[in-house]
């Protein structure tokens, strides 16, 4: 598949001459390439993934809106199944980079800008990403195919229902919804937020919970994260609702991987990723007080 994606990259109509794509690591659901054609470009090859509620037309619209908001690189070309971005020269962050107050003080304003500014630039129909509906859809898909972990689905969905009640009423922002460290690039002067395939309207708590869970922030840093975002001391109610959404984020990552075991063909150990995230979900869920 990677060679097929490379051939597709070479054939894109935007190039001024022959190009030789260089594979870039990091993608676990797409093929990514660096292309030099007078300047450097980042190429992302990926089809719609209905099983993950990923539609590339929404990703393209979100990517363009994120660029207009000043937080993501420019989309210079798009064809069905392919997007070409201006390449950002910089360092992709690692989870340990996020585990400092200094970095959180840089990341949180970027996330808040995404939440508040992208709706002003998004054009066309816009998606909503409600993690609990995603979990319901994943559970139905996994049960239908008799996934190897299907016996645990009723318990996971009971947990999801409890978490949804704990989250309660929400504010609506435009979320990134996949805040892995690998989606943040530091060019030495500023941060960029990339990879908008899951972008959609959501609660800000999901991005905050995902940022914490994906990068294993300490409890003290989690409180600091909430203080920076909401610009107010953290209340017990906010902390409780945030922790519930964080648990939902971990369960979604685990069930995303369970579905990916069946449907994705990228060379990646999805079963190990499933096990890792289920373990993290179980540990986080066990710490929640009864509602």
Which residue ranges define each predicted feature?
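An alpha-helical support segment within catalytic cores of ATP-dependent transferases
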Residues: 2-20, 116-177, 187, 227, ...
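Active-site acidic catalytic loop and adjacent metal/ATP-binding pocket
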Residues: 22-38, 42-43, 161-206
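ATP-binding pocket architecture of kinase catalytic cores
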Residues: 22-130, 134-152, 169
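A general structural signal marking secondary-structure boundaries and capping sites
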Residues: 111-122, 167, 215, 233, ...
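ATP/Mg2+ or Mg2+-diphosphate-binding catalytic cores
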Residues: 141-151, 255-291
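Active-site activation/catalytic loop segments of kinase-like enzymes and analogous catalytic loops
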Residues: 205-234, 247-265, 280
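Start-of-helix signal in alpha-solenoid helical-repeat scaffolds, especially tetratricopeptide repeats
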Residues: 240, 244-247
């Amino acid at each position: 598949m990677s060679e097929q994606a490379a051939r597709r990259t070479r054939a894109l109509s935007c190039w001024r001459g022959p190009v030789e794509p260089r594979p870039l690591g990091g993608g676990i659901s797409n093929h990514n390439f660096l292309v030099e054609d007078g300047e450097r470009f980042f190429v992302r090859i990926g089809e719609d993934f209905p099983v993950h509620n990923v539609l590339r037309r929404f990703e393209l619209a979100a990517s363009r809106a994120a660029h207009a908001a000043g937080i993501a690189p420019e989309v210079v070309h798009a064809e069905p199944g392919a997007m070409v971005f201006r390449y950002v020269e910089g360092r992709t962050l690692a989870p340990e980079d996020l585990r400092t107050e200094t970095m959180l003080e840089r990341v949180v304003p970027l996330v808040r800008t995404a939440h508040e500014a992208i709706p002003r630039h998004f054009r066309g129909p816009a998606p909503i990403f409600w993690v609990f509906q995603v979990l319901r859809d994943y559970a139905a898909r996994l049960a239908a195919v008799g996934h190897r972990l299907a016996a645990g689905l009723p318990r996971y969905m009971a947990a999801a229902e409890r978490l949804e009640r704990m989250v309660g009423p929400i504010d609506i922002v435009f979320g990134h919804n996949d805040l892995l460290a690998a989606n943040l690039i530091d060019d030495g002067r500023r941060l960029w937020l990339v990879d908008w395939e899951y972008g959609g309207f959501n609660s800000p708590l999901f991005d905050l919970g995902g940022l914490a869970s994906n990068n294993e922030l300490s409890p003290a840093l989690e409180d600091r994260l909430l203080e920076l975002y909401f610009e107010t001391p953290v209340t017990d109610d906010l902390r409780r609702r945030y922790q519930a959404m964080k648990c939902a984020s971990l369960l979604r990552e685990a069930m995303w991987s369970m579905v990916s075991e069946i449907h994705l063909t990228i060379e990646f150990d999805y079963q190990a990723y499933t096990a890792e995230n289920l373990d993290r979900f179980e540990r986080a869920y066990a710490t929640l007080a009864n509602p």
